[in-house]
């Protein structure tokens, strides 16, 4: 389920159903009036943001088990970069038809962020303790940044030249984290 909420008064405008199991990743293409949702069914769901109707639900790769977590868009070239917690790859998908353009071999992934200023994609690998820097044209891994413990979320500076990575501390049900989480700043120039 996706809830459409008014940003001014926080009232519910619409509820979009038929989005699959555990919709986890959301990415908005405001110009195209499309919202893309990834889910645990291994699907890419496309929603029309004017009508709040599901336009398509496409299973991206039937040959393996997938749990797509996050999605980042390159709206200029109609590409979605999608992370997978079940497979050691990031999918590159054409948002116009849901076809897979490439599978980038990297460890199981959590967060993904496209950087149009550098034409790069950044991906966190929580269990591996790494962040991949990927060329968005060739889909080659340019660099692997080792991080402490569990790299989690990603953000960019306004000029696209600095990457921020949140790092979660090791924690379990038996032993909670005792230190605060960290943020790593990576100069990309």
Model-derived segments and spans:
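Predominantly soluble domains enriched in secretory-pathway, periplasmic, or organellar proteins
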Residues: 1-189
